[in-house]
């Protein structure tokens, strides 16, 4: 009962679980996840909320993994809980994308959580991180190099992700389960030194406890709490410096001191769980002061990009290659062009709000509108006599270089009339069949 009081206390402090919540729980069948669900079931006597379990078989441990999967299914059945199970070939994916098993496992895990989250209409994801995980994460980040924000450990509440047992030690969890004869599975890889975190758990912490201080973990957790309080008191409000697309607005931070800028950058990266050291923060700070569009790799998955007005994080993808592809849209029609859905509709009501993603064109019924990417020498008309190279338009408009080859360009009668999201051109009047001209509304929606 003492442990449950700790859970209640933590829940009250951080508002982790409330009435009418729908919670997706990561369930491995191990002691931590079993203990988490047992505590959540007890919390249902105090709050009205739903629980759904998610189990992932990473196909790394053969029969052991299958045994865990079967146990998870039976546990859910016994406790009248709905469970979603998925098998993911983590080793094959890691080899294909050039990432570690841990990285791929984490990415695929949260990807599946998100899928189930949408399916059941959840508003929270609960993970079974315990107090030992907090301490191991602190040491792992300290060894690799990180910021003060990184040394906070694993956040108890991070947007929609909650960790209700994150202040309970593993030994107390095991003692509770064994005392109450609650079954669980043991992942044998937790006792192997193949993964860095396992090595910290199995070697480093026991060595320090035995040689220097038996209460080492308590001391580290006290330090984590102190760092959290310090960060909370000193941290800037990130939302004051970012736009609706979560990009840092450079104009708003130019008068901040270097100290505040670096703190802001740490907060900015930490929200995506990107771990970087002090040198990388210094490098990004120098990037902010430079001219033009530049970027820096953060890790295997992300890079940070500075353009003329913003600083933002982007996911690394395969290099984008321009293809000589032309999509021809008959008036009226609708078609997908890579990451864009393009609709061409005839309109009679001319009182249409002007939107950035729309173009109102005079054209002939059944004529063709072409869509493609830019080509060498492309020009756009500014008025009846003057045109300009699209390359120069991009420079004038300060369009980032990596975006210039991704913007759809629209042509009618072989003349460019619109660079999507950048510039609308002057269109000469059509002399022939002018009486048959109709109003055509072109709408572009990004579907990626």
From Swiss-Prot:
Gene Ontology MF: a single term: tRNA(Ile)-lysidine synthase activity
Enzyme Commission number, as recorded: 6.3.4.19
Reactions it catalyzes: cytidine(34) in tRNA(Ile2) + L-lysine + ATP = lysidine(34) in tRNA(Ile2) + AMP + diphosphate + H(+)
Gene Ontology cellular component terms for the protein in this record: cytoplasm
InterPro entries in the cross-refs: Lysidine-tRNA-synth_C, Rossmann-like_a/b/a_fold, TilS/TtcA_N, tRNA_Ile_lys_synt, tRNA_Ile_lys_synt_N
SUPFAM superfamilies: Adenine nucleotide alpha hydrolases-like, PheT/TilS domain
Listed transmembrane segments: none
KW Nucleotide-binding (keyword) present: yes
Pfam families, per database record: ATP_bind_3, TilS_C
UniProt keyword ATP-binding, yes or no: yes
UniProt-listed SMART domains: TilS_C (SM00977)
Secretion signal span: none
Ligand binding (ATP): 28-33
Superkingdom: Bacteria
Location in the cell: Cytoplasm
Keywords: ATP-binding, Cytoplasm, Ligase, Nucleotide-binding, tRNA processing
GO terms under biological process: tRNA modification
Enzyme class at the top of the EC tree: ligase
PANTHER family: TRNA(ILE)-LYSIDINE SYNTHASE-RELATED
Domain note: The N-terminal region contains the highly conserved SGGXDS motif, predicted to be a P-loop motif involved in ATP binding.
Family annotation (NCBIfam families): lysidine_TilS_C, lysidine_TilS_N
Function according to Swiss-Prot or TrEMBL: Ligates lysine onto the cytidine present at position 34 of the AUA codon-specific tRNA(Ile) that contains the anticodon CAU, in an ATP-dependent manner. Cytidine is converted to lysidine, thus changing the amino acid specificity of the tRNA from methionine to isoleucine.
Family statement: Belongs to the tRNA(Ile)-lysidine synthase family.
Protein name per the record: tRNA(Ile)-lysidine synthase
Species whose genome carries this gene: Fusobacterium nucleatum subsp. nucleatum (strain ATCC 25586 / DSM 15643 / BCRC 10681 / CIP 101130 / JCM 8532 / KCTC 2640 / LMG 13131 / VPI 4355)
The organism's taxonomic lineage, starting at the top: Bacteria, Fusobacteriati, Fusobacteriota, Fusobacteriia, Fusobacteriales
């Amino acid at each position: 009962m003492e442990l449950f009081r700790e859970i209640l206390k933590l829940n009250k402090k951080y508002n982790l679980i409330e009435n009418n919540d729908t919670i997706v729980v990561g369930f491995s069948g191990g002691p931590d996840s079993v203990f988490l669900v047992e505590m959540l079931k007890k919390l249902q006597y105090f709050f009205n909320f739903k629980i759904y379990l998610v189990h992932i078989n990473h196909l790394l441990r053969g029969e052991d993994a299958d045994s865990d999967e079967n146990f998870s299914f039976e546990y859910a059945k016994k406790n009248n809980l709905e469970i979603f199970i998925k098998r993911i070939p983590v080793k094959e994916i890691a080899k294909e994308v050039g990432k570690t098993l841990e990285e791929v496992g984490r990415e695929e895990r949260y990807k599946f959580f998100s899928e189930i989250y949408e399916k059941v209409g959840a508003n929270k994801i609960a993970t079974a991180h315990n107090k030992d995980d907090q301490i191991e994460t602190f040491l792992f980040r300290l060894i690799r190099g990180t910021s003060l924000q990184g040394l906070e450990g694993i956040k108890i509440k991070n947007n929609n992700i909650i960790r209700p047992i994150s202040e309970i030690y593993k030994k107390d969890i095991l003692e509770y389960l064994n005392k109450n004869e609650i079954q669980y599975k043991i992942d044998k890889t937790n006792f192997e030194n193949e993964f860095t975190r396992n090595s910290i758990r199995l070697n480093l912490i026991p060595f320090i406890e035995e040689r220097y201080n038996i209460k080492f973990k308590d001391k580290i957790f006290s330090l984590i709490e102190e760092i959290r309080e310090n960060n909370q008191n000193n941290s800037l409000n990130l939302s004051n410096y970012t736009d609706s697309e979560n990009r840092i607005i450079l104009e708003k931070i130019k008068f901040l001191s270097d100290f505040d800028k670096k703190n802001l950058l740490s907060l900015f990266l930490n929200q995506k769980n990107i771990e970087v050291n002090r040198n990388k923060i210094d490098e990004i700070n120098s990037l902010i002061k430079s001219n033009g569009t530049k970027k820096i790799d953060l890790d295997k998955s992300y890079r940070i990009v500075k353009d003329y007005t913003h600083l933002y994080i982007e996911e690394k993808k395969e290099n984008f290659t321009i293809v000589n592809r032309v999509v021809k849209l008959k008036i009226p029609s609708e078609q997908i062009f890579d990451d864009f859905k393009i609709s061409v509709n005839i309109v009679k009501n001319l009182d249409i709000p002007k939107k950035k993603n729309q173009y109102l064109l005079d054209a002939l019924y059944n004529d063709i509108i072409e869509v493609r990417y830019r080509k060498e020498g492309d020009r756009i008309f500014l008025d009846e006599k003057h045109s300009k190279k699209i390359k120069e338009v991009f420079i004038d408009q300060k369009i980032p270089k990596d975006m210039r080859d991704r913007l759809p360009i629209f042509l009618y009668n072989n003349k460019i009339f619109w660079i999507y999201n950048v510039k609308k051109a002057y269109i000469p009047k059509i002399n022939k069949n002018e009486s048959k001209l109709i109003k055509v509304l072109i709408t572009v929606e990004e579907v990626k």
